[in-house]
């Protein structure tokens, strides 16, 4: 009898100890200052914004200002590239595509116009060497009076756009590479780009409010619209090693490949002002590395106010989501938000 009582007491003690540990762990996450900072930044964020923080399988902080919620759909501009790069890597995972494949393997017209050496990797890292408009000017590039399909647009890129440098050598942040890779995927799979994105990325990730603007020609570099909740599902998948709700979307190897720097500062010729000094990986920018040079923090800011960030060392993701350009222009404010989050999520990150 005494032994049973002792055993029961020990079990209860373990349970209580676990619950106390759990409560203490959660009590350490006090985001009061973060919420106050968001409120104080209302004007700087254009009056409307959402901030979400995700860690350990759940959203641990959520706050909205103005008439804007985590479900509100808004343009995400260049944050679209992260989605497109992930879609590309899903085909690499299956062995249907290699990052070292030449674009001309799928689009022979590129060889005809001396662009046959451009690779898939060059396309998703802005290293094609082809002249092109900036991300924000895609609408002019896809003028419906001029192009009626992605096929026509990409053929025009191959035949009329000038090669300014050899592929793989100079970084120019524009729409060209992502436009080309979207057409490569269409040829490879005999499906429309948006259909493939839905089948492999947005639908499995329950991104129900994520789609593309109905331009005559789809914009795989900056034409998506999404919501804070939706995009956080995407970030959580990457943070969790490619798995979402128990289903594998990407391999861990694919995610690691996407995080590797593809540029050095000496290679960068054209880049957004807010990202000067940053190196590009694939679909994302490198915002932090460890003492060995391994990428630890990545982000993919969009012109229209989306700031998605993953800190792999501290194992959290956060997003600032707005319907306007104010947030995208304020990198110092975004850095201050991250600093306040880091203060609560302590880790030995160097």
Question: Model-found features: residue ranges?
Answer:
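Bacterial Sec-dependent N-terminal signal peptides
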Residues: 1-29
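Short amphipathic alpha-helical face segments that pack within enzyme cores
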Residues: 82-87, 179-183, 233
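Catalytic loop of the DD-peptidase/beta-lactamase superfamily, centered on the K-T-G motif
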Residues: 28-63, 186-191, 195, 199, ...
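Catalytic-site signature segments of enzymes, centered on catalytic residues
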Residues: 137-229
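Active-site-proximal loop and beta-strand segments within enzyme catalytic domains
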Residues: 39, 43-47, 67-173, 191
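Short glycine/proline- and charge-enriched loop/turn segments
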Residues: 65-68, 214-216
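Secretory-pathway/luminal and periplasmic proteins that interact with or process carbohydrate-rich
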Residues: 60-61, 111-118, 129-136, 194, ...
């Amino acid at each position: 009898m005494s032994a049973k009582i002792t055993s029961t007491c020990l079990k209860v003690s373990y349970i209580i100890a676990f619950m106390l540990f759990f409560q203490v762990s959660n009590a350490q996450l006090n985001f009061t200052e973060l919420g106050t900072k968001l409120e104080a930044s209302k004007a700087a964020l254009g009056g409307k914004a959402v901030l979400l923080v995700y860690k350990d399988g759940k959203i641990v902080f959520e706050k909205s200002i103005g008439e804007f919620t985590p479900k509100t759909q808004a343009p995400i501009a260049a944050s679209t590239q992260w989605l497109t790069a992930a879609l590309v890597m899903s085909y690499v995972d299956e062995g249907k595509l290699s990052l070292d494949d030449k674009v001309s393997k799928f689009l022979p017209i590129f060889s005809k116009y001396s662009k046959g050496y451009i690779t898939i990797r060059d396309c998703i890292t802005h290293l094609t060497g082809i002249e092109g408009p900036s991300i924000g000017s895609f609408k002019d590039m896809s003028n419906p009076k001029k192009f009626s399909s992605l096929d026509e647009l990409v053929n025009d890129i191959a035949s009329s756009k000038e090669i300014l440098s050899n592929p793989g050598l100079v970084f120019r942040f524009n729409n060209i590479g992502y436009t080309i890779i979207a057409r490569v995927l269409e040829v490879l799979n005999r499906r429309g780009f948006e259909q493939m994105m839905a089948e492999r990325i947005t639908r499995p990730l329950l991104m129900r409010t994520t789609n593309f603007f109905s331009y005559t020609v789809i914009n795989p570099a900056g034409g998506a619209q999404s919501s804070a909740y939706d995009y956080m599902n995407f970030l959580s998948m990457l943070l969790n090693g490619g798995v979402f709700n128990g289903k594998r979307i990407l391999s861990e190897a694919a995610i690691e490949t996407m995080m590797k720097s593809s540029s050095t500062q000496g290679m960068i010729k054209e880049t957004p002002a807010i990202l000067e000094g940053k190196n590009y990986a694939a679909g994302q920018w490198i915002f932090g590395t460890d003492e060995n040079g391994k990428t630890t923090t990545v982000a993919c800011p969009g012109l229209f106010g989306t700031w998605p960030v993953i800190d792999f060392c501290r194992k959290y993701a956060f997003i600032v989501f707005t319907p306007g350009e104010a947030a995208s222009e304020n990198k110092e404010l975004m850095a201050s938000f991250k600093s306040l989050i880091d203060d609560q999520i302590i880790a030995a990150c160097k």
